[in-house]
Amino acid sequence: PWFISAAVCGQGEPEVPSGVSYPCVAKPVTLSASRGVIRANNDQELVAALSRISKIIESAGPEHPRVVLIEEYIPGMEYVVEGLLDSGNWRTMAIFGKPEPLEGPFFEETIYIAPPGLGFDVEKKILDTVRATCEAYGLEHGPVHAECRINEDGVWLIELAPRTIGGKCSRIFQLGTGQALEDIVILNALGRPAPFRPPAGVIGVMMIPVQGLGIVRRVEGIEAARCVDHIEEIEIDVKPG
């Protein structure tokens, strides 16, 4: 897939770089949790996306470069790979499926489920792609977080970073295995044995994105939801008021 990097200065209307085709996705070269990841289907939408991303980068702080990556949009279902490298030896921690189609224009995190119900051959293709990328980058030790899409043309790597899964998602490892993901990563960094038990059964997390502006007055039904079978935790990040 093609990709182009472009600077966004925050002054005046951004220009569309040459070589862009549609649909495409624009995103900051830093940040996480899908902040500032926006699909564009034409020049007008791309200009609006670049303007919006510029403001997001500015609000995130001066340590974030004002650079945007514009890349080809890859259709398909999305999967997340969590792995651990120990002196070049790969260990798969989990493969998560994202069952909801993520077609844009925004790509809010919603549902992660492991195992994703893929066959052995498909999982092998995903892991082979991630491992090959780690080797190309020279990654040899530490956690790996990767996101891929799969369509009729094969497996496409969307992102890869030497870090653990973000936000509250790491909690599902402890809920599913009794082990904190952070403990395993620290033991591995210290060169000590870091035993890991694969999750027993199916584990998952659902994040509910905010659909618009407003003020939270109250959240109802939490206790009833906690009584539903297999729900282990409910957390509300936005407080009333």
Could you tell me what each predicted segment is?
Residues 124-146, 152, 161-217:
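Active-site "cap" helix and flanking loop/linker of ATP-utilizing ligase/carboxylase catalytic domains
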Residues 37-42, 84-86, 151, 175:
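Short beta-strand-to-turn element immediately C-terminal to the catalytic PLP-Schiff-base lysine
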Residues 154-156:
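Conserved protein kinase catalytic/activation segment
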Residues 209-240:
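Glycine-rich active-site loop/lid that clamps phosphate-bearing ligands
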